[in-house]
A protein has these predicted regions:
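Terminal, non-catalytic protein-protein interaction segments that mediate quaternary/complex assembly
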Residues: 2-288
């Protein structure tokens, strides 16, 4: 696989940013940190702290950026897989990342409403305005994609499938729809699909993403999808199983690097993101 990041740098980041969930080795059950793009953790907070530390450690090792349509990418781990053992512990509460719960809950409610209206999510963040193609609707409207976009309610379809066949491998919700390059958009959904697997009385969920920004995406995505997993388990009357989060590209943008992560030449002028960041920077997912 090759070296993703250096163990020494990883451990330094953990201490410098007080990523306390990683102090306890039982919270991170994978293997050696220098090759891992797969991690098993107890909760979402530990998941976020692990990937934040991994990306900063990789940036310290490489000191390179790559261009993208949404800005310079400071570090990237491809095919990053996270297994969360307890999805009911779904809130990022790290010292390095104060998660604005007003926005997180607002985004979840927007999904559950089935709305694709910019004005509805705009109640919680104006950042979505720059992502709308028509100034009225949003493409990354996961709730609308789940309930309305494909002509039937995918949420209810999953319920029906799992009630009819608890061992079904077809309880899948499709989020991203194909779109030709000749039809450009400002807003391409980062989430591809959600698959619910009911095994041994426990409902497991696997989310597959094409792209995920560790700063503005991961905290809110995991919060929303773990919440949906718990809701589905309650509806079916079963226990909550594990949550698996797969990202083709997991990354952090240069603009979101903490101030102390400047490159040796001093060319990196990014500022440390505000920990109490409010909603303006919160969750614009389309080009992550």
């Amino acid at each position: 696989m090759g070296l993703l990041f250096n163990v020494e740098d990883f451990n330094k980041v953990v201490k410098e940013y007080k990523l306390t969930s990683l102090y306890n080795k039982s919270d991170r059950l994978c293997g050696d940190a220098d090759i891992d793009n797969y991690v098993v953790v107890n909760d979402v907070n530990c998941a976020w702290e692990y990937w934040f530390a991994a990306l900063l450690a990789q940036h310290r090792m490489n000191r390179k950026t790559a261009s993208s349509r949404d800005g310079a990418v400071a570090a990237e781990i491809i095919n990053a897989i996270t297994v969360v053992k307890d999805p009911t512990r779904m809130i990022v509460k790290s010292e390095a990342r104060k998660m604005p719960m007003r926005y997180a809950v607002g985004e979840l409610l927007w999904y559950l409403s089935g709305s694709n209206k910019l004005k509805d999510i705009g109640l919680f963040s104006s950042a979505w305005e720059r992502m709308s193609d028509d100034g009225e609707t949003v493409n990354s409207c996961y709730g609308h994609k789940i309930q309305h976009f494909y002509g039937f309610d995918q949420w209810q379809d999953v319920i029906d499938r799992l009630k009819a066949d608890p061992n079904s491998r077809q309880a899948v919700i499709q989020i991203k729809n194909p779109r030709p390059m000749s039809e450009p958009t400002k807003d391409t959904p980062c989430t591809l699909s959600l698959q619910f697997l009911l095994r041994n009385g426990h409902l497991n969920l696997t989310t597959t993403m094409r792209s995920n920004d560790v700063w503005t995406g991961v905290p809110y995505d995991m919060f929303s999808f773990c919440s949906m997993q718990v809701m589905m388990a309650m509806t079916l009357g079963v226990d909550v199983g594990t949550y698996t989060h797969q990202a083709g590209s997991l990354h952090i943008y240069e603009r979101n690097l903490p101030a102390g992560e400047k490159d040796p030449e001093g060319n990196n002028e990014t500022q440390k993101p505000k920990l109490e960041s409010g909603v303006q920077e919160s969750s614009v997912k389309s080009n992550k």
